């Protein structure tokens, strides 16, 4: 089971780690950046020569600056585009520290004109413009900056989340970076798994930045994604049971020329473990249902007797599914 968090929950975890457990914000930033670089190089099997890192003016941009320095240590020729500063946005204190370090190491800085002109090509384009705290629409020059990044060739990777994607619901806030991969910290974010955010974030890789379970304090994550490993936790069926031990499901589905919905619904019912399945449908669907789902019991009748038949079936059933392919006519 993979737990997912919202932007607000992630901010709270950061704060708890810094304020309750006294881990400085800059230490968390360094650990996040190191984990990002390790994963990035692993994904490309250390075959990266050039990288462009586009940095916003907040902590996500600070991550980007640290990533640039760490990639340079690994022999990658890096260029930093300080997009947030270019557009006149106020910088965070951690960003300022990382900028000073990059300046001391003489890490190359490129301007928007050079990036948009396509004067250089990059093996990887790294998006560190906006993080999970974004809640406003991106507009103006910063929206144009994202469009410039999207037009570049090369492998595109987002830091924590694709810029412009709401971490809570996956909405596009004006415009968004289109990543091939996203390397996110500590937990997956809800918006990375919901449409359309999942299309912009690409494949999501979760790495540790040093935030532990203790940072939840008295709270806990509320959202999770089930994985194939979780299926092993489901109880096996006992040897002395039969199909009647696993519930009786009545499916009221299908109409003339709409037999497919009833078929798919019956198959899904068996797939999820229903014991006895009856399909209440019109007589015209008999042949295809008995051919496609022979294990289901078929119940049909003439119009003048359907009401009585349906009442009997409702008494029999433990649960009822109503509606797939039922149509909008008088019979429905």
Kindly give the residue locations of the regions a language model identified:
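Small-residue (G/A/S/T)-rich helix-start motifs and N-terminal tracts that mark the onset
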Residues: 1-84, 92, 181, 192-332
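Nucleotide and nucleotide-moiety/phosphate-recognizing core
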Residues: 37-129, 137-159
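Short secondary-structure transition/capping segments
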Residues: 91-94, 122, 169-171, 289-292
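Short gly/ser/thr-rich secondary-structure transition/capping motifs
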Residues: 104-113, 139, 163-167, 229-235, ...
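Short, hydrophobic beta-strand segments that form beta-sheet elements in well-ordered domains
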Residues: 108-112, 156-159, 184-185, 278-282, ...
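A generic local structural motif
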Residues: 110-115, 142-147, 168-171, 193, ...
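Structural alpha-helical scaffold elements that stabilize or flank donor/cofactor-binding regions
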Residues: 117-119, 175-176, 312-313
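Internal gly/pro-rich beta-alpha loop/helix module
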Residues: 123-124, 129-221
């Amino acid at each position: 089971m993979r737990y997912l968090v919202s932007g607000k929950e992630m901010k709270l975890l950061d704060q708890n780690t810094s304020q309750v457990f006294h881990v400085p914000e800059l230490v968390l930033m360094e650990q996040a950046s190191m984990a990002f670089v390790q994963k990035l190089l692993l994904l490309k099997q250390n075959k990266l020569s050039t990288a462009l890192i586009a940095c916003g003016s907040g902590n996500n941009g600070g991550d980007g600056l640290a990533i640039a320095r760490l990639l340079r240590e690994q022999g990658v020729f890096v260029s930093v585009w300080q997009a947030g500063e270019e557009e006149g946005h106020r910088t965070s204190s951690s960003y300022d520290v990382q900028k000073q370090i990059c300046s001391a190491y003489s890490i190359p800085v490129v301007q928007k004109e050079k990036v948009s002109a396509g004067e250089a090509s990059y093996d990887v384009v790294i998006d560190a413009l906006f993080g999970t705290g974004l809640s406003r629409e991106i507009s103006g020059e910063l929206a144009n900056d994202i469009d410039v990044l999207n037009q570049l060739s090369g492998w595109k990777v987002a830091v924590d989340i694709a810029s412009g994607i709401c971490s809570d619901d996956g909405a596009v806030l004006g415009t968004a970076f289109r990543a091939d991969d996203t390397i996110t910290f500590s937990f997956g974010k809800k918006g990375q798994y919901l449409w359309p955010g999942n299309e912009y974030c690409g494949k999501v890789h979760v790495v540790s930045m040093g935030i532990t379970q203790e940072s939840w304090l008295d709270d806990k994550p509320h959202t999770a994604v089930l994985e194939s490993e979780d299926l092993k936790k489901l109880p096996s069926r006992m040897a002395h049971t039969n199909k009647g031990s696993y519930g009786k499901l009545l499916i009221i589905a299908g109409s003339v020329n709409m037999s497919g919905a009833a078929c798919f619904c019956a198959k899904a019912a068996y797939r999820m473990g229903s014991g006895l399945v009856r399909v209440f449908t019109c007589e015209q669907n008999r042949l295809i249902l008995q051919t496609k789902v022979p294990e289901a019991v078929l119940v049909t009748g003439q119009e003048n007797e359907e009401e009585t038949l349906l009442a009997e079936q409702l008494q029999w059933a433990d649960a009822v599914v109503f509606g797939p392919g039922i149509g909008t006519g008088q019979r429905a």
